[in-house]
Amino acid sequence: MKVSVPGKALLLGEYAVLEGAPAMVAAVSARAVGRRVPRRGRESPVVQSVRTAAEALGATHGGGLEIDTDGFRGPRRNKLGLGSSAASAVAAAALLRGRTDETVYRVALEGHRAAARGKGSGVDVCAAYRGGVLACAYQPGPVEALPSEIPGLHLAIFHLGPSAKTSSFIRACRAAPSWNRWVQELADLAGAGVAAYRSADAGLWLNRVRAFGRAMEGLGHDAGVPVVTEPCRRLMDGAEAFGGAAKPAGAGGGDVAVAWLPDRSRVPELAEQVGLRALPLSVDPVGLRREEEASE
């Protein structure tokens, strides 16, 4: 059995989703490829946790798993922050269960969260399993499929450089005295942003993205961590100057950022101006997919 699973980029709702607010997440066209192999070798903590969750449901594939996440790495083999662990969890769950149904999602979510010691919203696992652009709450919870784009806007994903550990940023931000104020502002903006995206209001969506990025920056400042790094700030300013908007994609501190521009052809110009690399990625409408093997 062979499967492939997309990566993810968080579009809106960082931090606030941990407190019950909606988030928006996109599956992206970097795909993990997994296959069954006869012998079980050394497994990552995520795969081990998924195996434990799968075995609790009954018979599973007893052999090994091989999961290739090379598409989630940069030219220097650095991880890009595109959700390789979530994609690996979904791939492992499908291979162990021998199917692609909803039980696979539940096993992947349980295993991924166990490997993270109970942390994480689960929206990355949701995107990996379902594909497309989604509005979703803390998982398991409501999920709404949204259009892959707003007419007149182009999504670009930029690599910001080395990242900080997500859990350390979340811990620092939650410890900030102003956490409750900021998380309420982020929650309000996330809800308004989902509504703007749903109604395909490009101008309102861009305004919400800019405001969300500023609020993330304010939270990071109060918490003493660079949620918005200097490269990300350059991108946010540059995108706005081009008539668009940008923000960190995830907890911040590096990894990737998302930007929307009215003109797709200006993405290379923006990348050159801000000194960052636009990744060759797009929204992937397909989530978990069973692939044909040469021997089949």
What positions do the PLM features span?
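DPxDG-like acidic metal-binding loop motif
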Residues: 28, 79-101
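C-terminal nucleotide
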Residues: 2-12, 16-18, 25, 33-60, ...
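Glycine-rich active-site/cofactor-binding loop and its immediate structural neighborhood
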Residues: 254-256
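Short glycine/threonine-rich catalytic loop with a Thr-x-Gly-x-Asp
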Residues: 82-86, 246-251
